[in-house]
């Protein structure tokens, strides 16, 4: 086959595809689209839901909940972020997340238990082995920058969008590979910084109106140089 004929056939092959492979969305684009859909959904509802983490099931657990996360330094945020928190706190169904616990969860591992009785429980021995595997797999990851904001909200919690060029999703893919029984989830992984939980079902009121000025605002930039294993006690709210 001659070169010209090869080119013609290649062009015809490409034109048959409505969306060539290089048009496929990348991870950052997919994340941005997910954030837009979440915000759009918020504008279509008129009530918030109970999104507390400290449910009766949580408080009845005997062992700590273990997560892998990136902590967000307090100095990351510009003054407007603290103004946003004050605005959120005017709603009686809002419980702000303590600033010293701000983090981006990459993988939830489960509750510690000497005798696991479900897919969401793990033994201390399993945790040690899991972390050893992760150390090997993550050794080639390099530090990366993260921009936080603007504000967004599920029906049960307010959060900040995360712009990380897709790195948290890549970390999640590595970490979830070693989970013996990956958690059942309804939605794909999406990085987020939860800043408030809604503590009961209630009319939304002016929430969307109050958050709109902060929707496209960037609240800060920080560099992820490590991820942490955090144990959350289940004997306290």
Task: Identify the meaning behind each predicted range.
Residues 2-237:
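Histidine-dependent nucleotide/RNA phosphoesterase domain, centered on the 2H-phosphoesterase fold
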């Amino acid at each position: 086959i001659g070169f010209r004929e090869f080119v013609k056939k290649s062009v015809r092959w490409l034109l048959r595809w409505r969306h060539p492979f290089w048009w496929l969305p990348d991870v950052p684009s997919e994340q941005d689209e997910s954030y837009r859909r979440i915000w759009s959904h918020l504008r279509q509802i008129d009530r918030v839901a109970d999104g507390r983490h400290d449910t009766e099931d949580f408080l009845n657990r005997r062992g700590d909940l273990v997560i892998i996360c990136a902590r967000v330094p307090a100095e990351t945020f510009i003054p407007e972020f603290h103004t946003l928190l004050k605005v959120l706190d005017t709603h009686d169904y809002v419980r702000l997340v303590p600033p010293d616990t701000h983090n981006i969860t990459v993988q939830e591992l489960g509750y510690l238990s000497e005798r696991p009785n479900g897919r969401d429980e793990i033994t201390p021995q399993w945790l040690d082995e899991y972390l050893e595997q992760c150390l090997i797999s993550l050794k080639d990851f390099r530090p990366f920058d993260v921009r936080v904001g603007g504000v967004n909200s599920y029906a049960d919690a307010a959060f900040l969008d995360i712009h990380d060029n897709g790195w948290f999703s890549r970390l999640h893919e590595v970490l979830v590979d070693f989970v013996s029984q990956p958690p059942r989830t309804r939605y794909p992984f999406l990085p987020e910084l939860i800043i408030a939980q809604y503590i009961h079902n209630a009319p939304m009121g002016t929430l969307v109106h109050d958050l709109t000025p902060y929707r496209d605002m960037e609240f800060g930039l920080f560099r992820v140089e490590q991820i942490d294993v955090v144990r959350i006690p289940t004997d306290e709210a």
